[in-house]
């Protein structure tokens, strides 16, 4: 009886210790109370990058004045100045590899690195000479292709469109169904492409409250987040494989 009881007690102790350890690994922002949130970045503004799709509209008091600066609903203009018809609902300007768009009447505009508001101001300054002196046009710019990708140990791996042009890593993970219990929260991989096409990677720790002050807290367009499986997932997979093998062996032996 004692021989049976001792392994059971040891197993119970191991499970208890593992549960305490796993709680520390699962909780987000564990040291948040000791961190100064005043140091966090202010309101985030996305910056335009090559291959972004921009939707731009110009409004004036007289519609005929702004008409030349607006694409029709089913048209799109490329950087070589060619106007093409599109059967889809999306319209807009594709930023070329040099960071330029070809805007009607005005011509080529360099928009790479600008925020949405800066791009609006630039376009407004360029079209003013073509408008009546009394006109005060309203220019609206939207990034219609803004998206991030979340894969790995999450509830719903997916490509997530960002309609607000602002998304934190926490929001992205939440939309992807959050991390599963087997997700490695202390070592999230973020892959980011810069304006030159070079890819960079960094590791983020969701357990650390300092993440909120990180320059990687807010995601850029086309960021990729990968959540690795933790050791428990690997161990469970190994145990599952071994168990299946032993059941197969036992089945063969008992059938003889």
Per-region residue spans from a language model:
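Ser/Thr/Pro/Gly-biased, low-complexity, turn-/loop-rich segments
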Residues: 2-5, 20-256
